[in-house]
Amino acid sequence: MSDITRLMSPCEIPLANAARHENSIMYVDLNSCFATIEQQARPMLRGRPVAITNRITKNACIVAASYEAKALGIKVGMRRMEAEAICPDLIFAETEPAKFIYVHQKLRRIMQDYSSDVIMKSIDEGIIDLTKRPLDQASRSPLDIGAEIKQRLRTEIGCHMRCNVGIASNRFLAKTAAELHKPDGMDEITSANQRQIFASLKLMDLPGINTRMQTRLNAVNIFTPTDLINAKESTLVKLVCKSIDGSKWYRRLRGIEVDDTVSDIKSIGRQYVLESCHLSKQELEARILHLAEDLGHRLRSQNLYARGLFVWIGTHSDLYLHQNYLTRSAFHTNSDIMTHARQLFTKLPLHSARIIGITLYKIQPFADAQLYLDQPKRDREEQLCAAEDKINRRFGERTIYSADSFDTSQIKTKIPFGSTRFLDIL
């Protein structure tokens, strides 16, 4: 069992939200999730540098790396050639969504034993509201529960599985705590130890602070997390964020929950690294239409429509080109998405493409979609899509699909990062 760290300090930052217990939120984060799952499934990979890609091709990008690979400088987003130059012995494995979804579901069930309020933030991260524990868990300490979850992960999923656990009064501080001692750490941030913990961190160690945000903070003499704690709310509102977000930062730093709202879907996208630079026009179009069908299925699974479609390509010289289409008439049938995508891609030099992508945007609910003049035809298309979706949910994705996207089995299912909205249809 990993060390449990609980730093104490006489310096305290008062929590404005006194009604919430200091240790009411638990953040659980699997370590290097995809790579660790692969090492669990294949014991011969344990202790070795492993990189996960959607496909093993020359131009493939790394979507996950084992801790052994990270220690050698391998990073998410690297291309295969760049990674192999750093680590010639790097082992590549393709994503297998069925494995990842299985672990996600097992982890969620374990977490649900400790609260009626469990939110999965992504396939490998979840939040437990410990104020809603069942009676048989009510008297247990959060640290005890966290230790048990870590042990159950090993026992019920696999002995190689590890997770980080963070405990605090809100999601932001709990996530910060979960990132303190990777891999396999467990930490608690309270009003008594927050200043001491923050004194050991850099600004970009805090969730939500990127290079751009750090630059804005530095411009008003905020250089450390301690400076950020000490900053006045007015400074964060007027000078840093220039919006209500500054007030949210002031509050989340003090343990007040401001991140418990569910955001609407603003866009849905997919991309694909082409396996060859010698694909025919028909082969390229089939891959485009495969992506379009997949996006349509995801859009309809949430009863949503789109009004915009954005297509792009990346060339072998790393030039990125795009086209977009925006209409007043919302759409979500495969036919509409395919038609718009076809038209836009004809305006781009597909012969030089290394990667292609499609994004649907201006997303709106089903109830907001307007009627068409040719509504009977639209109704038939809707019914056809509904039948396709039902068959594919029952028998597996792409059991039935358009003949125009035939022979594209090499386009694998992609696990969405940062959301679990679409996992049920994969």
Give, region by region, the residue ranges found by the protein language model.
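DNA-contacting surface of Y-family translesion DNA polymerases
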Residues: P14-A18, Y27, M213-A353, I425
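Short, hydrophobic beta-strand segments
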Residues: I127-K132, L321-T327, A367-D374, I415
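C-terminal hydrophobic structural anchor segments
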Residues: S335-R394
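A glycine-rich phosphate-binding loop feature that marks nucleotide/adenosyl-phosphate handling sites
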Residues: I167-R171, R252-L253, Y305-H316, R354-Q364, ...
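Short loop/turn segments at connectors of secondary-structure elements within structured domains
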Residues: C159-M161, Y305, S352, A367
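Gly/Gly-Pro- and Ser/Thr-rich, intrinsically disordered tail segments characteristic of DNA damage-repair
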Residues: M1-R251, E257-D259, H297, R378-L426
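A short, surface-exposed helix-loop junction/capping segment
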Residues: P88, I268-V273, D368-A369
